[in-house]
């Protein structure tokens, strides 16, 4: 029952259309490149896409653009559910999982960056064009995610590199978008982190 309630909450869209196109484009970005991938690394099984689709629908995007944007979190699938698929793949090709994941991180990071223009096109098709200033900011967030994904494989166990890369950038993005307003809010944010 709890799983069904979580699924319903994820896909039942709130009415966020009144926020404006710029805010919706940022919501779409966060869903596709940060929250969706983070959720995918924690749970696997396409749950990142389920959560992303909930936000995408809440932004008023439907049909093919929603489906295409919703699939973007799957780029991080080698770390999905903490990476059992990568472990099996490494065993099959007789390569240490850390090495395979580190090599895959380069490919995933490049794919995230290369898919940005397609994402911007799909946002426009969905009624939320991304202006150049937003594109620059979004590219920096994706670059930070890609750099962390690659760099963390040198210092952390491969199973958590996707979670750490997406989680750190997601946290920074949310704090940047909604900074704490007072000392009490700062304490709550620090405790939550």
Task: Label the model's feature ranges.
Residues 1-14, 30-38, 189-193:
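Core transmembrane alpha-helical segments of multi-pass membrane transporters/permeases
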Residues 31-111, 128-129:
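Hydrophobic transmembrane alpha-helices that form the pore/transport pathway of multi-pass ion
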Residues 86-181:
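Juxtamembrane and boundary regions of transmembrane helices in multi-pass small-molecule transporters
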Residues 182-190:
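Membrane-interfacial entry segments at the cytosolic side of transmembrane helices
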Residues 10-22, 95-97, 128-130:
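Flexible loop linkers connecting adjacent transmembrane helices
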Residues 24-29, 134, 138, 162, ...:
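Residue-level signature of transmembrane alpha-helical entry/exit and packing/kink sites
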Residues 28-40, 143-153:
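Hydrophobic alpha-helical transmembrane segments and adjacent interfacial helices
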Residues 5, 9, 53-54, 87, ...:
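Transmembrane alpha-helix boundary and packing residues in multipass membrane permease domains
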